Amino acid sequence: MKIYLVGGAVRDALLGLPVKDRDWVVVGSTPQEMLDAGYQQVGRDFPVFLHPQTHEEYALARTERKSGSGYTGFTCYAAPDVTLEDDLKRRDLTINALAQDDNGEIIDPYNGLGDLQNRLLRHVSPAFGEDPLRVLRVARFAARYAHLGFRIADETLALMREMTHAGELEHLTPERVWKETESALTTRNPQVFFQVLRDCGALRVLFPEIDALFGVPAPAKWHPEIDTGIHTLMTLSMAAMLSPQVDVRFATLCHDLGKGLTPPELWPRHHGHGPAGVKLVEQLCQRLRVPNEIRDLARLVAEFHDLIHTFPMLNPKTIVKLFDSIDAWRKPQRVEQLALTSEADVRGRTGFESADYPQGRWLREAWEVAQSVPTKAVVEAGFKGVEIREELTRRRIAAVASWKEQRCPKPE
């Protein structure tokens, strides 16, 4: 029996990145030997065991053979005669097909070290094309390691295109697509994930609402980058700099979906694209089974981001109504989230990357003023039932009006 550290732990250590999870491959053993040694079996479809002390995963070396459609249609073979090289060959990328023995020596049968040095994401073998989930995984790796200068090998991108055009991605479940997307949204450069999907044709299949934005022009005066798809990825990049939250990043990604519905004869203007985009947000989220809290913020951002841009022009009643509409009294974090997504929208434009966004500050200040109006004082003044809410709203409007007169510049 020989045990090797494999995959991401070896890769990230070589890149000088923190190692989170360690996975091990066991060569020359059987399930019974593992059980006799005190390991606990957890894999049903293939033999994976937990170490009795560390609880890290130890898998018997195995090969996989395509036996059906999609990413679950595989038959596994695990036996003492399966070599380490056999096991590593089933991995997706060469940089993930690295192993380390107990002496610290790196075993590299597929030139993963060379690709690591050259910052290349390259598939190990043609078997890559048998698993459609790998298209999303490679896009996610491209986003995760973009800051280190990694790019996808030409032949790997070509294979991803072939898989997409062959309809392989249609076998992916919504849950798996969302899981990979959510993970990509946590990376430093989530926009790279969607750009890679577009490059291989997968964006049109999995995110048609986003793909439809490419080629749709916006007024050059406000959008020097002109193309709405490019602007969308720029805003996502900016959102990633402003917030680590997946819901903020996803909402920013979806903020302009309504522009994809504008008839070409009305281009480059997109009047009413915010409210129009709400239905597309709901459609996308329902299809991918996006969690409700993330969906709800994306709907609000689509509907209200343009309103926040015009903040100095809003009257106090409209501002308080906005807080009502986003349910800020029960979910105060939404004020900050809307301020961040609107800022990402403004700064996600060519030449505006370092622009100030005072509307975000004014929104936050107005919220502090509105929520500082005490409910207790209204109740103690003798108001009852619906009168309490009406009087509370009136006082909030008055407080915001007073603040706006002193602190918020008059619209030009």
Swiss-Prot record:
Pfam families: HD (PF01966), PolyA_pol (PF01743), PolyA_pol_RNAbd (PF12627). Optimum pH is 9.4 for AMP incorporation, 10.0 for CMP incorporation, and 7.0 for the phosphatase and phosphodiesterase activities. Changing D256A: Loss of phosphodiesterase and phosphatase activities. Changing H305A: Loss of phosphodiesterase and phosphatase activities. CDD domains: HDc, NT_ClassII-CCAase. CTP binds at G8, R11, R91, R137, R140. It catalyses: a tRNA precursor + 2 CTP + ATP = a tRNA with a 3' CCA end + 3 diphosphate; a tRNA with a 3' CCA end + 2 CTP + ATP = a tRNA with a 3' CCACCA end + 3 diphosphate. Both phosphatase and phosphodiesterase activities are competitively inhibited by low concentrations of the E.coli tRNA (10 nM). Cu(2+) stimulates the hydrolysis of pyrophosphate and ATP and completely inhibits the hydrolysis of 2'-AMP. The phosphodiesterase activity is inhibited by Zn(2+), Cu(2+) and Co(2+). Changing D306A: Still possesses phosphodiesterase and phosphatase activities. The keyword tRNA processing applies. Its EC number is 2.7.7.72, 3.1.3.-, 3.1.4.-. Gene3D superfamilies: Beta Polymerase, domain 2, cca-adding enzyme, domain 2. Its cofactor is Mg(2+); Ni(2+). GO terms for biological process: RNA repair; tRNA 3'-terminal CCA addition; tRNA surveillance. Magnesium is required for nucleotidyltransferase activity. PANTHER family: MULTIFUNCTIONAL CCA PROTEIN (PTHR47545:SF1). Catalyzes the addition and repair of the essential 3'-terminal CCA sequence in tRNAs without using a nucleic acid template. Adds these three nucleotides in the order of C, C, and A to the tRNA nucleotide-73, using CTP and ATP as substrates and producing inorganic pyrophosphate. tRNA 3'-terminal CCA addition is required both for tRNA processing and repair. Also involved in tRNA surveillance by mediating tandem CCA addition to generate a CCACCA at the 3' terminus of unstable tRNAs. While stable tRNAs receive only 3'-terminal CCA, unstable tRNAs are marked with CCACCA and rapidly degraded. Belongs to the tRNA nucleotidyltransferase/poly(A) polymerase family. Bacterial CCA-adding enzyme type 1 subfamily. Monomer. Can also form homodimers and oligomers, but with low levels. A single active site specifically recognizes both ATP and CTP and is responsible for their addition. This is Multifunctional CCA protein. It comes from Escherichia coli (strain K12). The gene is cca.
